[in-house]
Amino acid sequence: MIAELKGVGKEYQVGDQTIIALHPLDLSIKTGELTLIIGPSGSGKTTLLSLLGCVIYPTQGKLFVNDQLVNDMNQKQLAHLRLNTIGFVFQSFNLITPLNALDNVMMPLQLKKINAKDAKTQAEAALNLVGMLDRKKSLPKQLSGGQQQRVAIARALVTDPKLILCDEPTASLDASSIATIMEELVSLSKSGKSVCVVTHDPRLLNYADRVIKVENGFATEIKKNELTNAFTLV
């Protein structure tokens, strides 16, 4: 188990009003599984992902990531946990446009102060894993959307994280690119990593080991035998 939420909830104070972004829930993210987090826009999906990614603190309950209690950590400790345990893949790729694919993938290693030679070797290995080594010198603008996302996945993998969090990783991609990206994420989960994918796209349901539905700030697990009408769930 890589992450555990015990009665975890998240609220925001806006003036005199309390906004409940996520009602308290119990949830475990298991090793070697691909967990899909589904629900409409504004349902609380991104809040849940932000909690798992140690980007925000819970306002209720206890959050454990890699057997460490997140509630008690300061910002420096959180940054260290994220850098060494978690890989992030974003909808907008978040590649640095003046840098080529290899330099983009090397960025997290530079933050860890890995020497240049070792960083290059590790970055090339990550690009090779996603089938993009032959495009290592390409700038983001020279790559298709699917190729940019594969570079983003390589960047998330390069530090060998235990948990990979993906926020709408297939949005705006064509069907072929969606299949490629999801097959790579499934392969990563089968290699022993925990993968969580936030989406509102029911086409991704078939790739999941587990499905968490978030609606109006409430999160519940959907059983496999309840997925036949997938399009009614989101």
Task: Indicate residue ranges for each PLM-predicted region.
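ABC family nucleotide-binding domain
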Residues: 2-3, 8-25, 29-207, 211-214
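H-loop (His-switch) and adjacent beta-strand-loop-beta switch element
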Residues: 211-224
